[in-house]
Amino acid sequence: MSDNITKLSPAKINLYLEVLERTSSGFHNIESLMTFCDFGDIINIKKEKSFRFTIDGPFSKNLSLDNNIINKSVSFVEKLLNKNITVHINLTKNLPISSGMGGGSSNAATVILCLIEMYKLDCKEDFHQSLFSLGADIPFCFFRKSALVTGKGENVLEIENDYENFFVLLINPMIEISTKKIFEKLTIPTRKDFTPFNEKFLCNTKIINFLNSRNNDLEKEAISQCEEIKNILDVLKNETNSLLSRMTGSGSTCFALFRNKEDLINAEKIFTKKFKTFWVKTTKIVNSFETL
């Protein structure tokens, strides 16, 4: 049993996110092609005599130690083990809060993954489904592979693809947006010409055309709450060589895909010059991380 585990808790991006319907229970059924970046928060877990949870990093200041999804994740694993967990969990928070990059969900999933590895827990077949009770993005974040996510987030289908060589620019205006408010005010679009997802779109020559034909249905409502999102997207579309530019999740982070590093760096320079208070990060798509 390893007594000290450190893992990247990667940022996720929704390459597209379409809301198909609102269910009678108040949830929303979606279709989203989701992937990861090679940047994110860092989770370190060490065996100790009692439980401790600490947070550091550039975005640690406004995070609560008590009301945090990591504590819920620990309780989730304790129920599976039927014993108390005595570890020190340290979260290094590198991602902005409430940014649409799945930070909290990725943190929770990574903690669960580390604890399963540390305690050599044998997961049951329905384990992935039970993760949904912690949060809609957690099944995908635990899966740690590019996937088509449907239903309310509980259905995660691995996608074989060859677009890992895309470079990514992430931009956040440092304005938090409430996912709950976005969905409460969302008007679900009517789709006359809906193109079902097909894996044949996933080669480099076709994926960009396919993605540009899809949307993030949360973008319009997010812009009504944060006009800076529109400003970011306008610059990405009109002043850079981006292949795709879009908001991820419920915002306020936007991303753009680039074919080469030169275009990526040029776009980064534009944003650091125009928007000095924004968070800007260069990274790459990663199709999969180590899992169980």
Language-model regions, residue ranges each:
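ATP-binding N-lobe of GHMP and related small-molecule kinases
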Residues: 1-99, 116-122, 160-164, 172
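Short hydrophobic/aromatic beta-strand micro-patches
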Residues: 255-257
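Conserved, helical-rich catalytic subdomain that frames metal- and/or nucleotide-binding sites
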Residues: 53, 143, 148-244, 259-272, ...
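DPxDG-like acidic metal-binding loop motif
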Residues: 99-126, 140
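Short, basic/glycine-rich phosphate-binding loops at helix/coil junctions
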Residues: 49-64, 111, 132, 205-216
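Phosphate-handling active-site elements
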Residues: 78-88, 114-134, 260-273
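Glycine-rich beta-strand-to-loop/alpha-helix junction loops that act as flexible
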Residues: 103-104, 247-252
